[in-house]
Regions:
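Extended, subdomain-level signal for the structured scaffold at the beginning of enzyme domains
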Residues: 1-99, 108-119, 127-173
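Catalytic nucleophile serine of serine hydrolases
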Residues: 103
Length: 173
């Protein structure tokens, strides 16, 4: 029996490792981790690995989710433009569910309007975006601030996976 559902947002040129490592880690911890997209049935990652979408964002019920993961790559730049993506992330956040993000994924959180006053990390390439959105950026492998768990880059995936699972374990019903 699943402990809950963590929607993993995917789009064109997603960062391969930042989707697949967390997906497997969450599934090992007992969660369903469907790949959720906004259009195509499948996407290629930056390094060419295919990802077949399990569900469309518009078909997701945010109230049924334990969390959402916004991986990096170039996909967040496209996903952040979709109102359904932003609504899903904002609703999960407002319900107190896990909002996990790594690398360029915080672009989605910025566009959803949920980072002001929060502390998070990301790839240094979007540090200015994070700061200009009103968040406090730190250069650490992973940061947990309330229900937002963030990480910098693929080398931080082990710590990121552990932080996500720790958050979820501390919020199990």
């Amino acid at each position: 029996m699943s402990k809950g559902i963590i929607a993993i947002l995917v789009g064109p040129e997603y960062e391969d490792l930042e989707v697949w490592y967390p997906k497997l880690r969450l599934e090992e911890a007992g969660y369903d981790a469907p790949l959720v997209g906004i259009g195509d049935a499948s996407y290629r990652g930056k390094w060419g690995y295919p990802a077949t979408v399990d569900r469309q964002v518009g078909d997701m019920d945010a109230a049924s989710l334990a969390g959402v993961l916004a991986p990096g790559g170039w996909a967040p730049d496209k996903l952040r433009r979709d109102p359904a993506v932003l609504s899903l992330v904002r609703t999960v956040h407002d319900q107190g569910g896990l909002v996990a993000t790594i690398c360029h994924g915080p672009w989605i959180l910025i566009s959803a309007g949920i980072v002001r006053g929060r502390t998070l990390t990301s790839t240094v390439g979007i540090r200015d975006d994070v700061v200009n959105a009103g968040a406090h950026w730190v250069d650490q492998p992973t940061v947990t601030d309330g229900n937002i768990v963030s990480a910098r880059v693929p080398k931080d995936l082990p710590a990121f996976g552990a932080a996500m699972v720790q958050f979820l374990a501390s919020h199990e019903p």
